A protein has these predicted regions:
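Glycine-enriched, solvent-exposed interface loops adjoining structured elements
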Residues: 1-231
């Protein structure tokens, strides 16, 4: 965890050192009138990174309903087809995409490969009758259900909050914030420098993904319903 105060201090000593964002009389400190802007850009960067990389994951249970093949993954369906847990609440605003799902004995299934489990939209699952029958037989005599593992956005932070990123992606976040702040300062020089920082951001996350420096690549895991407090 990185306190936002520490993150902003690193920006002040680094990419934003010679900009109006830094207090002239107190080097290493973001000027109070620009603090809110830096916080807003940081949250924007956290959304960008957490939608590009599966940094934060959640899980929710889906119980099949008779003669229903399409299941929207929304808060409106909690208590009917969807069940979350007190320690892992499902929120529409945090949902990014389905990663995979697990049947009642913990076997992993992926989406959009065989045609049996599809995502017609980013937050909707569609199952063939054959796949629902398979899950029903696996769960029998209990009701047919599966556990869905999904990617979540980074929570919005406050000025006293913490950033939850792998160490290598903190640099990426610094580059993202600096690129947008400097670009917004106006003028061709600032625009060019902002573009340069954004290009560096894209290179950095590209290398991170290619080399899996932040260990964000997906691996198969077993996840039975008895785990993690789900009923």
């Amino acid at each position: 965890m990185i306190p936002f105060n520490s993150f902003s201090q690193r920006l002040a000593f680094g990419q934003l050192k010679n900009t109006s964002a830094v207090d002239e009389d107190n080097l290493g400190v973001i000027c109070p009138k620009h603090y809110g802007t830096i916080l807003s850009l940081t949250n924007q960067g956290l959304v960008d990174l957490s939608t590009r990389f599966p940094l934060i994951k959640g899980q929710v249970d889906l119980t099949f309903v008779l003669n229903q093949n399409i299941y929207p993954l929304t808060q409106a369906n909690l208590g009917t087809s969807l069940t979350d847990s007190p320690d892992d609440t499902f929120l529409d605003d945090e949902f990014v995409k389905v990663l995979d799902l697990f049947d009642a004995i913990g076997d992993r299934h992926v989406v959009n490969t065989s045609g049996h489990i599809l995502t017609p939209s980013f937050n909707t699952l569609r199952f063939t009758d054959a796949k629902i029958t398979e899950f029903t037989e696996i769960a029998s005599p209990d009701p047919a259900r599966i556990r869905i593992r999904y990617q979540k956005k980074h929570p919005t932070i406050t000025s006293t909050g913490n950033i939850n990123l792998p160490p290598n992606l903190e640099t990426a976040l610094q580059l993202f914030v600096a690129s947008l702040y400097i670009s917004h300062m106006g003028g061709p020089d600032h625009s060019a420098k902002g573009d340069s920082y954004y290009a560096a951001y894209l290179r950095h996350i590209g290398e991170d993904e290619m080399k899996d420096l932040s260990s964000t690549s997906e691996v198969e895991e077993n996840d039975k319903f008895t785990n993690r407090g789900f009923v």
